């Protein structure tokens, strides 16, 4: 009986871990690396990105940066993803805009050098997690 339960748990646990890959996110060149928070969101498709429904999102206080660099590893199953980053300098949990609608805080996307004012499409910054280790370096943009 115990052997059956153990075998069942190993099967369930093994199925859960199968396909889990390591994704390391690296960000540096913060305008102010000491104050504020970093908001990270991982998206799986255009519809979820458009509706701001992330697979995973979290906030990291900049006090946790090491020498002004953010580096964190997450586990994800095989698939396509896109990462959006906000340098939340005023710690209000959202992008702050000027009177003219220009972002006041830094932002960035995975594998995408954003050069316009328009919000990108998911296809602009998506990438595939297809091997056991994947590193994404995100460049922040400040206007």
What are these regions (language model features)?
Residues 87-89, 142:
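Surface-exposed loop/turn motifs at beta-strand-loop junctions within extracellular Ig-like
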Residues 1-23:
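Bacterial Sec-dependent N-terminal signal peptides
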Residues 92:
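Acidic carboxylate motifs that coordinate Ca2+ or other divalent cations, activating on Asp/Glu
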Residues 70-76:
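Exposed aromatic-hydrophobic patches
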Residues 19-46, 54, 95-143:
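Primarily secretory-pathway and cell-envelope proteins
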Residues 79-85:
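A short tyrosine-centered beta-strand micro-motif
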Residues 54-64:
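Solvent-exposed serine/threonine-rich low-complexity stretches and specific carbohydrate-binding patches
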Residues 62-68, 129-130:
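Short proline/glycine- and polar residue-rich coil/turn motifs
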């Amino acid at each position: 009986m115990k052997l059956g339960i153990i075998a069942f748990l190993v099967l369930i646990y093994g199925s859960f871990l199968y396909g889990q890959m390591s994704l390391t996110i690296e960000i540096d060149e913060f305008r102010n690396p000491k104050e504020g928070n970093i908001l990270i969101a991982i998206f799986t498709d255009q519809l979820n990105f458009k509706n701001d429904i992330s697979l995973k999102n979290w906030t990291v206080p900049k006090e946790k940066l090491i020498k002004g660099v953010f580096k964190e590893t997450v586990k994800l199953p095989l698939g396509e993803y896109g990462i959006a980053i906000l340098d939340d300098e005023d710690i209000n949990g959202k992008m702050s805009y000027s009177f003219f609608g220009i972002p006041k805080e830094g932002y960035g996307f995975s594998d995408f050098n954003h050069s316009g004012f328009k919000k990108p499409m998911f296809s602009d910054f998506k990438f595939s997690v297809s091997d056991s280790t994947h590193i994404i370096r995100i460049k922040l943009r400040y206007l």
